[in-house]
Amino acid sequence: MLVWLAEYLHQYQSVFNVFSYLTVRAILALFTALLLSLWIGPKVIRRLQILKFGQEIRNDGPDSHLSKKGTPTMGGIMILFAIGVSTLLWANLANPYVWFCLFVLFGYGAVGFVDDYRKITRKNTAGLVARWKYFWLSVIALISAFGMYAIGKDTDATRLVVPFFKDVMPQLGLFYIVLAYFVIVGTGNAVNLTDGLDGLAIMPTVFVAAAFALIAWATGNIEWSKYLYIPYIKHTSELVIFCTAIVGAGLGFLWFNTYPAQLFMGDVGSLALGGVLGTIAVLVRQEFLLVIMGGVFVVETLSVILQVGSYKLRNGKRIFRMAPIHHHYELKGWPEPRVIIRFWIISLMLVLLGLITLKLR
């Protein structure tokens, strides 16, 4: 929004041209989202406490989690607010990719909001009925996938980028929609499953978003895209603003979510952040890279799938003491901060590994 104002004022004062630079707007988007989160955080916590919107705890979980009961949840509202305001202020709103991300962010956030609200009002961890939850997540993902395909049809924007192979970029055609659907829905649920300890999900999200900011910039820059042998997609450069807004909002939320947490993001935050990371991965054509950089999310999801499969196929036998896998380590006796920090370290290493693969082609 402010890009248009800066372009107008540039006619009268050249100094306003600085706001047209992508790097300047990206940094300002980060700090805007960060400061907004820090500003509204205490207000959100107080309001949630007044409304008695507290976290419900599973009875079969680690005993250490019982003390978390009643901690304000649905803090993802402040993350979405900070990202939304920052993006609307600093991104070029004529860019369709920005709107796809905002649509998924708030669409998935709305589904998560209903899920959280039902958990709170019904005083259990069941939430929204699974079939309806996945129905609405699927509708939002498919609308986005069809829209993205319509814009990028038969261009480099619908090619499949395979790590390590610079000449392997097949045109996906309609399969682009199928891939986009599974990436968006899958990532949304993966981040949701990871969000089980204080700060566990938000920091890997920040790492991945920061990496995608660099990738979006390179993909939207014709010289760098040629240098890295990745498709040049002109609309992706504005996703840098969206990614840095995620980083800022995420760090602001972590201020209140670090152990012991004063606030949980809830499904309204985890589903929204996961869904939008999946959307960004599709838009910059780096779905495989998301699997690498978001390895913590992948492992958490696989641990649940394997646990459920083992329980059903092996007459109640479990692979892990509890799934997702972060609870397994808690039940082994690891203190919660140790689990969190080690998962952060692994996440950072995987993000760096993912970035390195861009050059190893």
Curated annotation (Swiss-Prot):
GO terms for molecular function: metal ion binding; phospho-N-acetylmuramoyl-pentapeptide-transferase activity; UDP-N-acetylmuramoyl-L-alanyl-D-glutamyl-meso-2,6-diaminopimelyl-D-alanyl-D-alanine:undecaprenyl-phosphate transferase activity. It catalyses: UDP-N-acetyl-alpha-D-muramoyl-L-alanyl-gamma-D-glutamyl-meso-2,6-diaminopimeloyl-D-alanyl-D-alanine + di-trans,octa-cis-undecaprenyl phosphate = di-trans,octa-cis-undecaprenyl diphospho-N-acetyl-alpha-D-muramoyl-L-alanyl-D-glutamyl-meso-2,6-diaminopimeloyl-D-alanyl-D-alanine + UMP. Pathway: Cell wall biogenesis; peptidoglycan biosynthesis. GO terms for biological process: cell division; cell wall organization; peptidoglycan biosynthetic process; regulation of cell shape. It is a multi-pass membrane protein. Its cofactor is Mg(2+). The chain crosses the membrane at residues 21-41, 74-94, 97-117, 132-152, 168-188, 199-219, 239-259, 264-284, 288-308, 339-359. Keywords: Cell cycle, Cell division, Cell inner membrane, Cell membrane, Cell shape, Cell wall biogenesis/degradation, Magnesium, Membrane, Metal-binding, Peptidoglycan synthesis, Transferase, Transmembrane, Transmembrane helix. GO terms for cellular component: plasma membrane. This is Phospho-N-acetylmuramoyl-pentapeptide-transferase. The gene is mraY.
